[in-house]
UniProtKB/Swiss-Prot annotation:
Positions of the catalytic residues: 308, 688
One Pfam entry name: Cellulose_synt
Zn finger intervals (RING-type): 9-47
Record-given protein name: Cellulose synthase A catalytic subunit 4 [UDP-forming]
Gene: CESA4
Organism: Oryza sativa subsp. japonica (Rice)
Consequences of knocking out this gene: Plants develop a brittle culm (bc) phenotype with a reduction of up to 80 percent of cellulose content in culm.
Taxonomic lineage from the root: Eukaryota, Viridiplantae, Streptophyta, Embryophyta, Tracheophyta
Length: 989
């Protein structure tokens, strides 16, 4: 009937036939059966019975023929419109559908000439009322059916509440700032101001009351005290606005999801190692295993291990680690164990069955521990084999020579162990990508030590995975909190916070430290006090490990929104913490913007060229604009333009490894901005300070994240000599920055983006080694005073006594209030004070002289890798004595003050009662020095409380020197004898 011009079904638009022979009203079979089931057997248009013969059949035939011949185009047009209407979904506007059906009804009515006479009282056709009534009933029936189906499929009320909660959490902030209580912070600030005032009055007294009988000692002491006051200001005021932060990992999951369909951003992990004999492969392997097992979608995690020593031992141990990871990773995720470094998990002295409900856990844990012990034996066998290098060099398993036999002259090497093309775990699940990287090294090329290795990893990862975020760890820092990456993403992926965040820094926490923390390895005062203070300004400094970077910030770009400019060139502490108006762009950014405009015009001109390929045009533009900054790699340059990460679509997967080898070649960085404005910055052995400083100068801010469970843990050098060498390297890096063009005293003023208190903290970071000079002089003063009988302070008046007492009280109260808001213990504070003196009179002094010699004579400073503890005995390394020249200055000061105390008491015994009063002040001064050096003295004594031979020889030598000096001074000669001798000298007897 459709071929003869009958339109589709008037109800649903499907293929129809003429249900009513009288008026040719079109209905499909389904709608006709539905009407019959509901008892409707009459036509909705004419009211006649469905299927009844037409009383005027001939006339009807003529009319139908007329419809076919005369109105075929009209019927076709209507058929088109109805077909389109039938394709509308049930959720579309019902008015549109009704209007289409009305048009169809009117068209059929006018053509057939039937029913126009059947109208109701209002003049509206009866058939139209019936059609609309029928349609409404049908819609109500469908709506009730849908409602019943939806109710059947609806989750329980509890699940609906949880879904609503998740939806609410998805729009909540992912983190918040927890300000320090005013009850704690206000008194703290008041005491700081009071201490500053008292310090000024104290200096006024000291300068205006010289000691003429000991003018040299007095002048030395005043200069030292002024420097200490300046150093205190640099250290104290950046702690003016301390804050705490809290993260909401559940909200992160609610917003971005979890699992394979998660919207979480990919993260590339960087692990760097140099010498596997000083950095045991088992420690590096535990770090890698903890990374592969983090609680994060596996397809979004990649681990890059940089072997800067090109050691086959590292390569083979990493291959063993990749195989063991196939068992370890699913075990960790199945039972949610913490930490996920097997060495530290199995060595925990806790109830490992707590909160475990799986019956198979004990059995699988026992089997896993056995597998790990077998894995350790294999690693130990590799280490034992590597102790003696063959004359012909190392040979790989396939019989070919190891390319890295010469660590100073070898090609670049990359090996992908796990990932999309690698093996899966034993449960059949995908594993994170694990990549071994050893950059090319050739004679005559600068390699820039760790900073150069990190920049090589930046380029390799950009070519292979190009995650928008980078998290770097030292080889001895394992992931202690499997949710650490999610903690960082709570800041990075929060739209209200993460736009201007260049990195999230986690505090360093350590295992294997003695209970008393003799050498302040935990560094609690810095990580729990200073870093919280900096977080309230522009953010914490970068400390070299445990830091999650935004990749675009490493490329030298500024933040999307620039920070405020100060109203004047001199800014007070109050304006440094407060937001201001949007800053103007610096000259460098204006130049960069102009370059972008030039590029846009170049793009416009290139588009005018006919048949010019889009990909070739973009590559040409990238090379013209970025090759001087990023180097000659089109794939890498294109990856830098992808702010959200991901491998460029134009990159050929088959050539990515070849491109990755190219970007780690030794000459790739020549004539580029790498190490100057891009990546880790060169010029100091402490590249971390310099890199973070450059980012803050560009206007970025950083975040300090302190989760309840420490994110990462590492090993610290608890041996005295190793600890001092570590401090020496840090101090040397600060001296190098101080003597370079990047010194915070004069660098970074152009854009005004570095807050003044933040600059003050960086100045303190690079100036503190120079405190060793006045500190050594000040520590020698009490012994000199005891030996000479003179003192640096004149007889105290009442006013002077008030200033001295006020200064001491303000120092004590400031420290107590600082402990109160930070939550650290008094023992940690005292250990920090002791090691400040120990490091200041030893490592810092050597760092100053080495840095000056490097600047004047061009002597290069050798980077010494801190050996990681491998002693099986608990705290075994603590008692090992390793002699080094760094120990000479503190040993000399210690012996000098001990000799001075003995000499002082001897002099008092011979001088009478009057000399005991001044003696107490001098002895207290000397005992203050000895108390601060007491941990150093214990370190010299060793495990058996016996002094090593070398120290005995030094002590005898120094004691002899000072004994001769003592005899020269003759403290036993009384004043009357001295007067007589001097009088006789004036006469010729």
């Amino acid at each position: 009937m459709m071929e003869s011009g009958v339109p589709p079904c008037a109800a649903c638009g499907d293929d129809a036939h003429a249900a009513c022979r009288a008026c040719s009203y079109a209905l499909c079979k389904a709608c006709l059966d539905e009407d019959a089931a509901e008892g409707r057997t009459t036509c909705a248009r004419c009211g006649g019975e469905y299927g009844a013969p037409d009383p005027a059949h001939g006339q009807g035939a003529v009319v139908e023929e007329e419809v076919e011949e005369s109105h075929e185009p009209a019927a076709g047009g209507v058929r088109e419109r109805v077909t389109m209407a039938s394709q509308l979904s049930d959720h579309q506007d019902e008015g549109v559908h009704a209007r289409t059906m009305s048009t169809h009804a009117r068209t059929i009515s006018s053509v057939s000439g039937v029913g126009s006479e059947l109208n109701d009282e209002s003049g509206k056709p009866i058939w139209k009322n019936r059609v609309e009534s029928w349609k409404e009933k049908k819609k109500e029936k469908k709506a009730s059916a849908k409602k019943a189906a939806a109710k059947a499929q609806a989750p329980p009320v509890e699940e609906q509440i949880m879904d609503e909660k998740d939806l609410t959490d998805a729009y909540e902030p992912l983190s918040r700032i927890i300000p320090i209580s005013k009850n704690k912070l206000t008194p703290y600030r008041a005491v700081i101001i009071m201490r500053l005032v008292v310090l000024g009055l104290f200096f006024h007294y000291r300068i205006t009351n010289p000691v003429y009988s000991a003018f040299g000692l007095w002048m030395t002491s005043v200069i030292c005290e002024i420097w200490f006051g300046f150093s205190w200001i640099l250290d104290q005021f950046p702690k003016w606005c301390p804050i705490n932060r809290e993260t909401y990992v559940d909200r992160l999951i609610a917003r971005y999801g979890d699992g394979e369909d998660s919207g979480l951003a990919p993260v590339d992990f960087f692990v760097s190692t140099v010498d596997p004999l000083k950095e045991p492969p088992l420690i590096t392997a535990n770090t890698v295993l903890s990374i592969l097992a983090v609680d994060y979608p596996v397809e979004k995690i990649s681990c890059y291990v940089s072997d800067d020593g090109s050691a086959m031992l590292t390569f083979e141990s990493l291959a063993e680690t990749a195989e063991f990871a196939r068992r370890w990773v699913p075990f960790c995720k199945k039972y949610s164990i913490e930490p996920r470094a097997p060495e530290f998990y199995f060595s925990q002295k806790i109830d490992y069955l707590k909160d475990k409900i799986h019956p198979s856990f004990v059995k699988e844990r026992r089997a896993m521990k056995r597998d790990y012990e077998e894995y350790k034996v294999r690693i130990n066998a590799l280490v034992a084999k590597a102790q003696k290098t063959p004359e012909e060099g190392w040979i790989m398993q396939d019989g070919t020579p190891w390319p890295g036999n010469n660590p100073r002259d070898h090609p670049g090497m990359i090996q992908v162990f796990l990932g999309e093309t690698g093996a899966r775990d034993f449960d059949g699940n995908e594993l994170p990508r694990l990549v071994y990287v050893s950059r090319e090294k050739r004679p005559g090329y600068q390699h820039h030590k760790k900073a150069g290795a990190m920049n090589a990893l930046v380029r390799v990862s950009a070519v292979l995975t190009n995650a928008p975020y980078i998290l770097n760890l030292d080889c001895d820092h394992y992931v202690n909190n499997s949710k650490a990456v999610r903690e960082a993403m709570c800041f990075m992926m929060d739209p209200s916070v993460g736009r201007d965040v260049c990195y999230v820094q986690f505090p360093q926490r350590f295992d294997g430290i003695d209970r008393s923390d003799r050498y302040a390895n935990r560094n609690v005062v810095f990580f729990d006090v200073n870093m919280k203070g900096l977080d309230g300004l522009q953010g914490p400094v970068y400390v070299g490990t445990g830091c999650c970077f935004y990749r675009q910030a490493l490329y030298g770009y500024g933040p999307p929104s620039l920070p405020a400019l100060p109203k004047s060139s001199v800014c007070s502490w109050c304006c440094c913490c407060c937001p201001k108006k949007k800053a103007e762009k610096s000259e460098k950014e204006m130049h960069r913007d102009s370059r972008r405009e030039d590029l846009e015009s170049a793009i416009f001109n290139l588009r005018e060229i006919d048949n010019y390929d889009e990909y070739e045009r973009s590559m040409l533009i990238s090379q013209m604009s970025f090759e001087k900054s990023f180097g000659l790699s089109s794939v890498f340059i294109e990856s830098t333009l992808m702010e959200n990460g991901g491998v460029p679509e134009s990159a050929n997967p088959s050539t990515l490894i070849k491109e990755a080898i190219h970007v780690i070649s030794c000459g790739y960085e020549e004539k580029t901005e790498w190490g100057k404005e891009i990546g880790w910055i060169y010029g100091s052995v402490t590249e971390d300070i310099l890199t973070g400083f450059k980012m803050h100068c560009r206007g970025w801010r950083s975040i300090y994240c302190m989760p309840i469970r420490p994110a990462f843990k590492g090993s610290a050098p608890i041996n005295l000599s190793d600890r001092l060498h570590q401090v020496l390297r840090w101090a040397l890096g600060s001296v190098e920055i101080f003597l370079s063009r990047h010194c915070p005293l004069w660098y970074g003023y152009g854009g005004g983006r570095l807050k003044w208190l933040q600059r003050l903290s960086y100045i303190n970071t690079i100036v503190y080694p120079f405190t060793s000079l006045p500190l050594i002089a000040y520590c020698c003063l009490p012994a000199i005073c005891l030996l000479t009988g003179k003192f640096i302070i004149p007889t105290l008046s009442n006013a002077a006594t008030i200033w001295f007492l006020g200064l001491f009280i303000s120092i004590i109260v400031t420290s107590v209030l600082e402990l109160r808001w930070s939550g650290i213990g008094i023992e940690d504070w005292w250990r920090n004070e002791q090691f400040w003196v120990i490091g200041g009179v030893s490592a810092h002094l050597f760092a100053v002289f080495q840095g000056i010699l490097k600047m004047i004579a061009g002597l290069d400073t050798n980077f010494t890798v801190t050996a990681k503890a491998t002693d099986d005995t608990e705290f075994g390394e603590l008692y090992v004595f390793k002699w080094t020249t760094v120990l000479i200055p503190p040993t000399s000061i210690l012996v000098l003050n001990l000799v001075g105390v003995v000499a002082g008491f001897s002099d008092a015994l011979n001088s009478g009662y009057e000399s005991w009063g001044p003696l107490f002040g001098k002895v207290f001064f000397a005992m203050w020095v000895i108390m601060h050096l007491y941990p150093f003295l214990k370190g010299l004594m060793g495990r058996q409380n016996r002094t090593p031979t070398i120290v005995v020889l030094w002590s005898v030598l120094l004691a002899s020197v000072f004994s001769l000096l003592w005899v020269k001074i003759d403290p036993f000669i009384g004043s009357s004898e001295t007067t007589t001798t001097n009088s006789c000298a004036n006469f010729d007897c």
